Each structure stands twice: as C-alpha cells, then as structure tokens.
Amino acid sequence: MTETPLPGLPSAWLLGSPGRVLRVVLASAAVAPPGTGAAQHRAGRDAVGAALRRAGSPVTSVGRAYSGAPVCPAGFPASVTHSTALAVAAVAPGARGVGVDLEPRCPDLKLHRFLLDERERAELWPRGDPPGLRRLFAAKEAAFKALSDCADAHGGLFWRVRLGLRDGRLWARAGDRYALVGELAAPAFALAVAVTADP
C-alpha cells in the first residue's frame, strides 16, 4: 500500500457526546493511475486494512458487501471513500456505525434545493457559497454511511439525513438515530467523518 497523506488528515479523530467519546482511526492510500474503479476499490481495501491495524483489530483483511461497503470484524465498523487519486478509510472501534466522505469538487449549486431543507440552508449555509455546499455534501454523505441501518428513516437517500448544530457541534439525524459529524475543509477538498452517538 502506498500511503498518501491528505494534507491535514489526522491519524485519529475523537468524536462523541459527553461521557462517550469515540476514537475514529483514519488511513489513506494512493489510487494507482489512471484511477479506474478497480484501482479505487483496491486502494480503499488497503486503506481500510491500514485503519483496522491502527485501531487494534486482529483481522485486517476486508470483504465487500453488495452495497459496496467494507465487511469488517465485529466491533470495528469501517467506511471508505475514494476519488480517482486517493482512498480514505475510517474505523471506529466500538461504535454502531461510522462514515467518511471526501469531496474534491464543489457540487452544482442547484443541488442545494434537494440536498438541504430550508432550516439547514438558513442555519448551515447562509452565504450560499460553493465550498460551503461541498462541505455539507460531504457531511451528509458521511452521516448517511454511519446511519446506514436507518433506511426506514432516510429511504436509502443520503440527502434525507438532516443536519443541525447542537452545542456548537454538527449532528446528523435519520429518524431517532444520530451521528456526530467532524469536518476538515481545505481549498482543494472537503472531508467529513461521522460516528453514531447519542446527543
């Protein structure tokens, strides 16, 4: 595996609610040129394996579910995201779910109409700027992955996951389940990590 650190990518992130802080371990891997789908998936598996190792898992090889999500050992939920150049994996030992998303490009601004509801636009995207929408797109996608077992609440559609601020932290909700979202934004990308937690 060729580890390619994303500038500013921490090796671990602490997310959680008071009294229950969860460690999310991150790892990245370069995607072999020319960045085909198969190369992205290989890099993703490599990144998940590295994150599992760092998290203390006795098993570091991963399978792949029909949905494309990594199949990991019990107690070590994982998520992966990739572009044509880089894969990033997150593992959250002991959590119910974890999600990660990397967005190198800003989405079309017209997407805000179905991506965000009126409250989310007012609270989280008041400037209406492209980097802000990219950041929220990544946050919703990461939260959707963390809350993947809430299909009855979000219908399998990531934009139905709702975001909001609580005590200065970004939370996601699908039905009665919550995930805490951490964000890392730079001029060239937005990265979000979400872990299931109780507010």
Describe the function of each predicted region:
Residues 1-199:
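Core catalytic alpha/beta fold that binds nucleotide/phospho-ligands
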